[in-house]
Amino acid sequence: FIRRFKDNNLVPTLCDAPNLDPFGACRVCSVEVALEKNGVLKTLASCHTPVSEGQHIYTSTETVKTLRKNIIELVLTDHPLDCLTCEVNGNCELQTVAAQVGIRNVRYPEGDNHLYRMKDLSHPYMTSDLSKCINCYRCVRACDEVQGEFVLSMYGRGFDSKIIKGLDASFMESDCVSCGACSQACPTSAISDVFQSKAIQATDTTRTICTYCGVGCNLEVSTNNGEILSIRAPYDAEVNQGHTCLKGRFAFQFYDHPDRLREPMIKKNGKFEVVTWKEAYNFITKKLI
């Protein structure tokens, strides 16, 4: 029943996404449920608990508030606290949820962590920084459920578990098709696209349709003074449901390329000449007739 509460910001989430199946990895969405009024309360993960008749759902009891705060504190003990210099500062779900549950400091002492993990900068459009991974599985599920490529997987167990590409290769050495579904799904910047940080500078977001093929994928284009900064796929689009391909997401720099044709042209005496749209349509009509 998380879908009923998420739009109202009553229940925070980290491992849930609108285009992914419920998973229950983070437990940040926990709520208390009773089968009758003033009945015995049971703490459940709201992302994969179905709504049933007679339920009494409590989203903001002191118990669940404390639980959520403890979970986020534990997550932050193994996460870089470099928000001010992070590429997704201001556009990070973990940052948003931490503020929502009231985190101001972490009570737990510093211990073993994964902050030493190196970045993967092999891909021209995406970066991977697993020191910021919170093991929510969203990237793995996006690769599996949305794109169907099964490139990403979880390797190891317990504290040593980590996301790998292929057989623990780099992005470019793996079978990644560069769709960017994982970067859009990631709630931190463990996997991010190189344009994601620029979206914060956007002054406008425009809903449009991709022109690369005839599928008609919906896109959300972030711009600043007419310059395209980044592109995301909206989750509420009926056609592509929060997904798009490599071209739709990353190949937008053609729009202001100097080689792009901006006016109709007709070949006259072996050379292309700029004409009006009326002349171009008349030319096409004559050819069709």
Regions flagged by a language model, labelled:
Residues 1-4, 35-40, 54-79, 84-289:
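N-terminal export/assembly segments and adjacent metallocofactor-ligating motifs
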